[in-house]
Amino acid sequence: MAKVYIDKDASLDPIKDKTIAVLGYGSQGRAWALNLRDSGLKVLVGLEREGNSWKVAESDGFNPMHTEDAVKKSDIVIFLVPDMVQRYVYRERVAPYLRDGMDLVFAHGFNIHYKLIEPPKTVDVYMIAPKGPGPIVREYFAKGGGVPALVAVHQNYSGKAFEKALAIAKALGATRAGVIETTFKEETETDLFGEQVDLVGGITQLMRTAFQVLVEAGYQPEIAYYETINEMKMIVDLIYEKGFTGMLKAVSETAKYGGFTAGKYVINEDVKKRMKEVLDRIRSGKFAEEWIEEYNKGAPTLVNGMKEVENSLEEQVGRQIREISLRGKPKS
């Protein structure tokens, strides 16, 4: 089992006298900047232009500056701009101002693992990957808790990169829950795999296909939505809170029997084989190459995919079901 690092295993000492530049002020950027500042660290916010994020940062009490100015004044640079933008920000706004002994920090390993960013050997490169969205990272921290995180070291020029990674994790609140050490390779490949075959791709497609099967068989769309999509939250919540065994204990005997038999029929060895093929594409770098090419063309697959989902019957029915659910929600 992996070692879990908690508060007592980490100290802010390795970074307490450092100036930290947070590049980006979106979901994760805002949470990181606020949590690091509230932990007593000196934080600068670096942005590409004076847009909405600039105004939000100002309203939060920061004095945002252009990215290159933040880099020039900092010891630690944290990349919290979108994955597909990072290499351009690094090349144009960060690399020209890097000094020996600086730190480059990432929340996801994509750009380092696939060599879209190749830092000089004279800087530390490490990662802290919170296992939750930015608003939750901030909310849990503000309430005295924390979201778990993964940490990894790619380059250890100073000999203290891991200690600094733990320090930032502590400042984010992650060590209040638990931090697990990984590698850039492992985090990147497992994260992409989970998104594609499970969280964003697999489960979404499974629910939509199940809905379509019922509707095509003549069942009312509203009933089909309840049975194949809406109730997913209840099952996932049970798994999150009690594990698979706890979830199974909470459902009926009929549901368990049907699940054990039909589940393995639908998600069979052929599906597992295809999952392995998806993993092979991720590990070989083919997915990254394809995604970069797609992005450079304006991401037509994303544009068309979003249009198809937005106009689908299940999305239309879902809006109606959510309205019904909201009407029945108790007033707080």
Curated annotation (Swiss-Prot):
Task: Report residues binding Mg(2+) 1.
Answer: 191, 195
Any idea which positions bind substrate?
Answer: 252
Cofactor(s) listed in the protein's UniProt record: Mg(2+)
The cross-references to Gene3D superfamilies, in alphabetical order and at most eight, read: 6.10.240.10, NAD(P)-binding Rossmann-like Domain
Query: Which positions fall inside the KARI N-terminal Rossmann domain?
Result: 2-182
Note on cofactor: Binds 2 magnesium ions per subunit.
Binding of NADP(+), residues: 25-28, 53, 83-86, 134
Instruction: Identify which residues the record assigns to the active site.
Output: 108
Q: In which pathway does it act?
A: Amino-acid biosynthesis; L-isoleucine biosynthesis; L-isoleucine from 2-oxobutanoate: step 2/4; Amino-acid biosynthesis; L-valine biosynthesis; L-valine from pyruvate: step 2/4
Ordered alphabetically, the record's keywords are: Amino-acid biosynthesis, Branched-chain amino acid biosynthesis, Magnesium, Metal-binding, NADP, Oxidoreductase
Say what the protein does.
Involved in the biosynthesis of branched-chain amino acids (BCAA). Catalyzes an alkyl-migration followed by a ketol-acid reduction of (S)-2-acetolactate (S2AL) to yield (R)-2,3-dihydroxy-isovalerate. In the isomerase reaction, S2AL is rearranged via a Mg-dependent methyl migration to produce 3-hydroxy-3-methyl-2-ketobutyrate (HMKB). In the reductase reaction, this 2-ketoacid undergoes a metal-dependent reduction by NADPH to yield (R)-2,3-dihydroxy-isovalerate.
PANTHER family per UniProt: KETOL-ACID REDUCTOISOMERASE, MITOCHONDRIAL
Stored NCBIfam families = ilvC, PRK05479.1
Family to which the UniProt record says this protein belongs? Belongs to the ketol-acid reductoisomerase family.
Query: What is the protein's name according to its record?
Result: Ketol-acid reductoisomerase (NADP(+))
Query: From which source organism is this entry?
Result: Sulfurisphaera tokodaii (strain DSM 16993 / JCM 10545 / NBRC 100140 / 7)
